[in-house]
Amino acid sequence: MYNKENVFAKIITKNLPAEIIYEDKQILAFKDIAPIAPVHIIVIPKNEYIDYTDFISKASIDEIKHFFSKIADIANEAGLDKVGYRLITNKGEKSGQTIFHFHFHIIGGKKLIGLINNND
């Protein structure tokens, strides 16, 4: 069940601050508060989705298309289109998901090495 008190829900309602870099009726993008690269942007839908599976199963085709096309636009605006970037989403606690509102990380601005961190 979606928790309306999660951090991203509070950012959407402006009850928590964020350095917003893009916003429209469906999407919000903002800088990560603990970046792991020079460019680290979080992109979220404004509707209530817990994770990728929830988003894909409940969102309209138009909303899905808009979300993913805007991720590309945001990455390009950040200057990452020519140098490359990584897109990450996590699903569930064991994947590393800590905020249960569907989101993508756009990470770039430096050479990214490795795919996962195996700290047991």
From Swiss-Prot:
HIT domain segment(s): 7-120
Gene3D superfamilies with a match to the protein in the record: HIT-like (3.30.428.10)
InterPro entries: Histidine_triad_CS, Histidine_triad_HIT, HIT-like, HIT-like_sf
Residues of the signal peptide: none
Motif stretch (Histidine triad motif): 101-105
Pfam families xref list: HIT
Domain of life: Bacteria
GO molecular function: catalytic activity
Protein name: Uncharacterized HIT-like protein RP317
Organism field: Rickettsia prowazekii (strain Madrid E)
